[in-house]
Amino acid sequence: MSHLFTGIGAAVTTPFTEDAVDYEQFRNHLTFLKDNQIQSLIVNGTTGEGSTLSTEEKMNLLNVALEVSDGQIPVIAGTGSNNTKASIEASKKAEELGVDGLLVITPYYNKTSQRGLVAHFTTIADAVNIPIILYDVPARTGMTIEPETLQILAEHPNIVGLKDATGDLTHLSRLQAVVNDSFAFYGGNDDLALPFFAQGGHGLISVAANVLPSEYQLMFETVKIDIAKANLIYRELHPVVEVLSIDVNPIPIKVLTSFLGFGQYEVRLPLVPLEEMDQASIIEVFRHLKGESV
């Protein structure tokens, strides 16, 4: 099986008005990403505030993404939760809409075991007929997919990849050792993009690519031919990545999507916007990177 995508996928933000999703600006943002070399659109994930979207909103967002993509780049739906039954229902609905794949997070709060992870992911994978990327982000879930667990899960024909947001490249090496080359690894940490690529990562599901899609894709392509030049690109992008870590994702990145005109600066409770001084700092770093051209 070929990989669902290689290169840079955008973990897309969801623009809001004060009380609703701004579908028009969502469409505009996706069009911008598609026109600037993004290789995949990941919708309703962490960055998209999927945990505070209604089922109707999630389906509407996926429909817009599918219209914009028009079959040219994969649309991947975030459908995971800590409720296996609910994850199956969301996954089936997304599949019916025509998405290309699913991003399914490890269950949080319940504190299951590694055996529980195998049962959870396998049950979801059995219920659909499209590719699944597992999503390991222990900072948000409190648990990690261990190599022995991944080795079992990777045998399922619908489980084709892993988004590794552990921030641990040694752990990545252990995971890579237990699967074959057809299994894809996608980075989930923008600050580790270059070493992740150099270690054989197939791509990155990126937050910063919401506003720097072509720059990140260029870095990915350059790694394969000139690691020193790729490192220069990585270092140029790093100040933006660093300033986007001043608060929990997606609070900072939405400052920049709003700055570029893709909706108001709104996040949904329990998230709250940054203070104006911090917003200004983010914009200043971004403008410096872009040479004041924005």
Report the location of each language-model feature.
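Secondary-structure boundary/capping positions in well-ordered alpha/beta enzyme cores
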Residues: 72-73, 131, 160, 182, ...
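Catalytic alpha/beta core domains of metabolic enzymes, predominantly
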Residues: 126, 141-245
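Short secondary-structure transition/capping segments
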Residues: 53-56, 89, 114-117, 145-147, ...
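Alpha-helical structural signal in soluble globular domains
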Residues: 36, 60, 64-69, 93, ...
